[in-house]
Amino acid sequence: MEKKRTLSVNSGNNELIPPQPPSSPKTKNSLNNIENNECNNNNNNNNNNNNNNSNSNNLNNSNNNNINTSSNSINSSNSINNSIDNIDNKDNHQQKYYLPPSKMNSSQEFQSYLTPNKNNNNRNNNNRNNNNNNNNNNNNEGTIQNFTSRMLNSIIMYMIRPFLVGASASFGISIGMFYFSPFPPSFLPSSPS
């Protein structure tokens, strides 16, 4: 004798399915279908949980990566600032041993050269700017000189030189014509006969 199996499965309307005797094959099939549906529901729930876990992992990984990259960029900027500070400190250390020229006699100016401060840095920056301005002026003078020399060369090559060549050629041709003509002028010697 088979025992009666009673299964209570929640349907869409939250209603309990009443127990049925397993005498007919239809009831057996329905019970098997109910068990299969339960298994499928469990599998679907597991899949959903896996998907949720994978999504959360993706979010965590992406957030962590973004945070790490931003922290790396911040660290790189800090290293740049530190290197600039080190350069400034080296400049200041060298300025401590720099003596002023002989024309500076006051104690304040002497002290300003011995102790690095903002005024000293400003003085160095002004010197750099003056050097840059001098270089720019020299470059401008060089370009002006090059321009004038090119203009003079072009004038000589394309205006004066052809005139000189043409004048000399015409003068030579005219002298030759007079020299070999049957009636030479009186100021030229007679042509050889």
Curated annotation (Swiss-Prot):
Keywords: Membrane, Transmembrane, Transmembrane helix. It is a single-pass membrane protein. Residues 29-86, 119-140 have a biased composition (Low complexity). The chain crosses the membrane at residues 158-180. It comes from the Eukaryota. The keyword Transmembrane applies. One of its GO terms (cellular component) is membrane. Coiled coil: none annotated. The keyword tRNA-binding does not apply. Residues 1-144 are annotated as: Disordered. Residues 103-118 have a biased composition (Polar residues). This is Putative uncharacterized protein DDB_G0286829. It is found in: Membrane.
